[in-house]
Amino acid sequence: MKTLQKFGGIAALYMAISHLIGIVIFIVILDVLSITDPAQKLAMNIEKQTVIFSTNLLMYVFFGFALIVLSLALYDRMKSGAPALMQVATAIGIIWAGSLIASGMAANAGLATIVTLYAKDPTQAALTFQAIESITNGLGNANGEILGGLWAL
C-alpha cells in the first residue's frame, strides 16, 4: 500500500474520532444544548476558554489538515476511474479544509480578544463576540456544511 493511502486512512480515522470527541465535548462538557442566550454563550467561552481553544484546534484546524491529506489520498486512489470528477472533488476538499482551518484559527484569535476585553468591558466583549462568531461561522460553513456536502457527493 502506498504511503499516501496509509496517511489518508489515518486522516480519515482522525476525522471520525475527532467528531466523536467533539460531540461529547459540546454536549457533555460545554452543555451547548442548554445555552439559549448570547450572554450565556459569552460566559461559557470565558469560563472554559482552554476547552474551547483545544476544541477549535481539534475540530477545525487539525481536522482541516487531515481533510487535505484525505482529499489527496482519495484523488490518488480514484483518479483513473473519473479524473475530472476527482479533480473537482479534490479542489472542493482543499477549499473546505482551508475554510475550516481559517475558522478555527479566527475563533481562537477571537477568543483571546474577548477574554481580554471582558475584563475591561463585558458589554463590548459581548458585541465583539457576536461579530467574531459571525465571521467564524461563515468561514466554518455553519450554514449547513455546503462544502462538506458537495465534497461527500
Question: Could you tell me what each predicted segment is?
Answer:
Residues 1-153:
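Hydrophobic, aromatic-enriched alpha-helical segments typical of multi-pass transmembrane helices
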